[in-house]
């Protein structure tokens, strides 16, 4: 694997050994209705059943156990990160396992359910403005004040390696998989999965899915250079509002086969479709990948790409806010054959 990348497949293997005793082997489920809609065999990697309700515990726990080894005589005074919710919950849980305080910098606009969960796990919350710049600046200040270690939610190599363990499981659970579809925000999960898949089964496609309102990954691939979102994106998929970064971009640039963008209505309808037809309470961020596979654009993918695994990234749903958009979205034409 190219030396310019921040991690190698060996790092993913180490992460798997590092965390496997403390995480769930999440199931892969299927849906005959969604298969009919797409004309493909869909498999759903259910990270909503993971500890803390999302895939984020994989990277967070690997980071804490890698950056704070037991061999150290003096543990750091804290771990710090910025997060819209899921990474914050995961890092707090991981830090608690290792007996370390956690400080989480959270955008003021983060869903209440995620903020309350972070507090319930025992973290101290510090609020920031909903922009990448504010997140970074406040987190840096808190790290200095607490004499802690910063664990970036998607650019820390140990986090990226931890997220890559998803692909290790998928390739075992679905041996004939032709492609993985992964929602992308900062790109940690996408990069980790891409490194793993291309190391073990280079012929398997890795597709990214992101909201059209937060399409920095798509724009970066299109223009061949890093193109972060200029303004805080407005999307219901709060977990993918971050832009890809310097560590995830080279991997995504070289190893991700294609990127599919989806509208807010497509995300809402796909999320609701999974709720009602699969009985899985996914969050809208997890619905982004489903929306991508159901989109008109995805129909251009070769029919030889038959067996597709979609990573359902999490299930930390703000039920109160969901009431305001359920049933209100205009259903895309591709959904017309299913009554939702």
UniProtKB/Swiss-Prot annotation:
Positions of Ca(2+) 4 binding: 247
Catalytic site: 56, 84
Nucleotide-binding listed as a keyword: yes
GO MF terms held by the record: ATP binding; calcium ion binding; D-serine ammonia-lyase activity; glycine binding; identical protein binding; L-serine ammonia-lyase activity; magnesium ion binding; PDZ domain binding
Residues engaged in binding Mg(2+) 2: 178
Binding residues for Mg(2+) 3: 210, 214, 216
In-chain residues carrying the UniProt-annotated modification S-nitrosocysteine: 113
Protein name: Serine racemase
Source organism: Homo sapiens (Human)
Gene name linked to the record: SRR
């Amino acid at each position: 694997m190219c030396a310019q990348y921040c991690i190698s497949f060996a790092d993913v293997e180490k992460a798997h050994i590092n965390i496997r005793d403390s995480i769930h082997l999440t199931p892969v489920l299927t849906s005959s209705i969604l298969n009919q809609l797409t004309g493909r065999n869909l498999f759903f990697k259910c990270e909503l059943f993971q500890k803390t309700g999302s895939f984020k515990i994989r990277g967070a726990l690997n980071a804490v156990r890698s950056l704070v080894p037991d061999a150290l005589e003096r543990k750091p005074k804290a771990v710090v990160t910025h997060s819209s919710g899921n990474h914050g919950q995961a890092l707090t849980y991981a830090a608690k396992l290792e007996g370390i305080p956690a400080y989480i910098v959270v955008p003021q606009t983060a869903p209440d359910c995620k903020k309350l969960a972070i507090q319930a796990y025992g973290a101290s919350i510090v609020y920031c403005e909903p922009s990448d710049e504010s997140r970074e600046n406040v987190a840096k200040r808190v790290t200095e004040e607490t004499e802690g270690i910063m664990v970036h939610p998607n650019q820390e190599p140990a986090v990226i390696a931890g997220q890559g363990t998803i692909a290790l499981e998928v390739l075992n659970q679905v041996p004939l998989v032709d492609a993985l579809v992964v929602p992308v925000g900062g790109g940690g999960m996408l990069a980790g999965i891409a490194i793993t898949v291309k190391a073990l089964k280079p012929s398997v496609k890795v597709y990214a899915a992101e909201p059209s309102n937060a399409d920095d990954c798509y724009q970066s691939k299109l223009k061949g250079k890093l193109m972060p979102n200029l303004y805080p994106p407005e999307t219901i998929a709060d977990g993918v509002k971050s832009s890809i970064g310097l560590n995830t971009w080279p991997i995504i640039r070289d190893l991700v086969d294609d990127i599919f963008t989806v509208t807010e209505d497509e995300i809402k309808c796909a999320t609701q479709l999974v709720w009602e037809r699969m009985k899985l309470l996914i969050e809208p961020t997890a619905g982004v990948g489903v929306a991508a596979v159901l989109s008109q654009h995805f129909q251009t993918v070769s029919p030889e790409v038959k067996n597709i695994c979609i990573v359902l990234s999490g299930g930390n749903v703000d039920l109160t806010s969901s009431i305001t958009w359920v049933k209100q979205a205009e259903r895309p034409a591709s959904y017309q054959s299913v009554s939702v």
